[in-house]
Amino acid sequence: MNENDIWLIAGLGNPEAKYDGTRHNAGFAALDALADKWNISVGKTKFQGLWGQGEVNGHKVVLLKPLTYMNLSGDSIAPMAGFFKIPADHVLVLCDDITQTPGKLRIRPSGSAGGHNGLKSIIDRLGGENFPRIRIGIGAKPHPDYDLAAWVLGKFPPEDAKAISDRYPDLEAAAKLIMDGKLGLAQSKYNG
């Protein structure tokens, strides 16, 4: 294992129990699924986040759930990346995406925040857009006048929650490919 081969995988969400199972916490739930699959305990606290570390396919991995609330996610992610000397292109972010149907994955090597305040905070704190992300479809608002905050902070109906959890094996495989330097392959296999 290369000593410099370390990845930070951050799942975005809001920390209070009342947000468990909400659309905006799809990133937290996905990170929990990875932690469970990889047998990494995410229970230590540092830089306003819950974190744990382990090894996956020969890569050192730090898993992080920022406890800053969504809109300040970068305030936890940037210091954690700095502490472990992890470059931005080795920071993989898992977050919700209202432009995609529930369970659809959108893997990107970089890009704008696309209206996502958690991504905006990370871009601001890391100083650029050059970090990979897996966006998890949570479904669009039922109509344009529906309040966005009410939608993303609402709970998933069971069928949408299942559509997302059914994709966790694909998300895990995609994360491994990304760490292996095969993001393009992850996109072709798992986008959609």
Predicted ranges, named:
Residues 114-118:
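Hydrophobic alpha-helical segments within soluble ligand-binding/sensing domains
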Residues 1-110, 120-134, 141-147, 154, ...:
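Nucleotide and nucleotide-moiety/phosphate-recognizing core
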